[in-house]
């Protein structure tokens, strides 16, 4: 944001020293608003999340605060030092100097197209959720989950058939076993509700032993029970396991719903206070709900066919709240520029001010989204199997959030503003 603002000041004909000074000054409002709204989602995550999610929320908040400090103080100090010592600082290459600097597009005039596209995606998501549902993890359903590694490639169907013969209960729903490949072909993820309402150590040991008896024949070399249940990641057998009772699962569902709801309310209130018009908050909040719902809908559409696990669990809720934080950051930058243009050009019609404001922030929007996507793709490709579903949700969120900031949040706010202003007149 700061660098793009400095580039704008340079294009306006200001000297380097003044451009740096004004670039920082004019970027403060957007930076602080954007980061505070993301911190709000981090606080909500910490309040409603469990241990690992709380750790993620803490890291997120600390990261935002340190980035904010470094951007505002350290970066400025270094830029001013370089400018004073060498008299020049390059903020772009010749080929990128005016990239997206002179965009002329009627974003507001084309808003009906974006409404149709988003409505179609929402309808598809609703159909998918009604017919296919979601791949809910044990966080929300309750149950036992295991990741088991074999010393040779195995078939998920063969593993499931073997387990069905051992994990037998009077309640058929608690006897069902779900088996999916987890990463390599010699790793399987096993989910069962067999005796999941009894989380005692004795029952856990009993279930572990039954799974061992069912699966020991799939190893080319003999494996002992102790070796099988060791939960060491670098050996064969169970490399991770988790058990969640029905009461805890129910609490997690409510916590997830409260987390998303309260984050939307808190962000909506903050936008209302900062921009002094509820219309902006309504546009932003509806766009955030749109983003979260589309990510959920796409997970519903794709979990049957993707080669990696798309599970809706606590980590997924953390991803949704992170998406909300990222999307509102992008939206606030655009809203802040619209507010600035309305102040500078009060006689210009609001539609023109909005179009100019979006066009002037487009370079920053694309650069930020592009660098974020590159980083997420690197983690998605090189990271472990456990991260892929989480990172995939973030990738979807960045793409959808960038689109909605420009084509959903701002147009909705514009339409509501027009109607309320007409009623006032």
Protein language model regions, located:
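A structural signal for conserved, well-ordered secondary-structure elements
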Residues: 1-425
């Amino acid at each position: 944001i700061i660098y793009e603002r400095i580039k704008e000041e340079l294009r306006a004909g200001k000297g380097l020293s003044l451009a740096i000074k004004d670039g920082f000054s004019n970027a403060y409002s957007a930076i602080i608003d954007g980061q505070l709204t993301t911190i709000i989602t981090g606080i909500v995550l910490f309040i409603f999340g469990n241990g690992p999610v709380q750790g993620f929320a803490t890291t997120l908040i600390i990261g935002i605060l340190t980035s904010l400090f470094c951007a505002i103080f350290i970066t400025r100090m270094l830029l001013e030092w370089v400018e004073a010592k060498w008299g020049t600082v390059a903020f772009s290459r010749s080929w990128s100097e005016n990239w997206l600097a002179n965009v002329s597009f009627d974003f507001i005039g084309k808003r009906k197209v974006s409404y149709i596209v988003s409505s179609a995606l929402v309808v598809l998501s609703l159909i998918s959720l009604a017919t296919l549902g979601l791949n809910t993890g044990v966080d929300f359903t309750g149950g036992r989950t295991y990741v088991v590694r074999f010393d040779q490639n195995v078939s998920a169907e063969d593993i499931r058939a073997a387990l069905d013969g051992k994990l037998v209960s009077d309640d058929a729903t608690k006897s069902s076993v779900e088996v999916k490949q987890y990463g390599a072909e010699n790793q399987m993820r096993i989910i069962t509700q067999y005796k999941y309402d009894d989380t005692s150590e004795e029952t856990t040991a009993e279930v572990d032993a039954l799974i061992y008896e069912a699966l020991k024949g799939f190893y080319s070399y003999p494996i002992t029970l102790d070796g099988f249940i060791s939960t060491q990641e670098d050996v064969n057998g169970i490399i991770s396991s988790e058990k969640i009772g029905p009461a805890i699962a129910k609490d997690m569902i409510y916590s997830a719903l409260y987390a998303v709801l309260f984050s939307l309310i808190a962000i909506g209130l903050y936008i209302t206070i900062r921009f002094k018009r509820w219309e902006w908050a309504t546009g932003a909040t509806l766009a955030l709900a749109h983003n979260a719902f589309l990510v959920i809908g796409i997970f519903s559409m794709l979990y049957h066919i993707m080669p990696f696990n798309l599970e809706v669990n606590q980590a997924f809720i953390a991803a949704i709240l992170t998406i909300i934080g990222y999307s509102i950051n992008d939206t606030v930058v655009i809203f802040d520029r619209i507010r600035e243009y309305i102040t500078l050009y009060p006689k210009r019609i609001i539609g023109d001010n909005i179009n100019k404001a979006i066009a002037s922030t487009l370079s920053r929007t694309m650069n930020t989204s592009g660098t974020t996507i590159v980083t997420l793709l690197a983690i998605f490709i090189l990271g472990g199997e456990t991260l892929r579903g989480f990172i995939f949700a973030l990738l979807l969120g960045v793409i959808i959030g960038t689109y909605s900031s420009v084509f959903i949040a701002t147009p909705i706010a514009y339409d509501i503003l027009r109607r309320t202003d007409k009623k006032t007149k």
